[in-house]
Amino acid sequence: YLVHLVQAAIEDTDLPIVLHLDHGDSFELCKSCIDDGFTSVMIDGSHLSYEENVALTKKVCDYAHDVAARGRYVTVEGELGRLAGIEDAVNVSDEDAQFTNPDEVQDFVSRTGVDSLAIAIGTSHGAYKFKPGQNPKLRLDFLDEIARRLPGFPIVLHGASSVPQDYVKIINEHGGNMPDAIGIP
């Protein structure tokens, strides 16, 4: 139903509107959303082994880019690494969180064909992130290395609203592009 509401709302506007699926966990869900008119999907295979994540993400990218070849542009965001926290139906404990391995990013992007890549460098999802005294332990060295290995490629930081104000400037200095972010006071 959401797609039809959005389509009706944008009929009389020239505004560019994106309808995005966040944390799709299966090919079938991503395909259904693309078929229903979504312009962007995130396939989250971060709970799978590396090779399974590559295969699932590539399958979604192949389908989305085939749709794009027929004239309707659809972008795909992949995820490499696992953020701690709770968002949508995804609940990842600290113990199960996993930083993105910079040694895997080039291979993942080239083998899957993703249009953007969500990475895990220490940010966290949902209400989990607002516990007092738990500032994120950001791996800015990973961000630097990933940006170096994927120059100009769109990198996504999920859970970035958990970042304290003074870290926003640091992230931007390390290749981030969050000019209007204010962070947590």
Q: In which residue ranges do the predicted regions lie?
A:
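Alpha/beta enzyme core
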Residues: Y1-D14, H23-P154, Q165-D180
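Short acidic/histidine-rich active-site segments
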Residues: G159-S162, I182
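Short, glycine/polar-rich helix-capping loops at beta-to-alpha or helix-loop-helix junctions
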Residues: P185
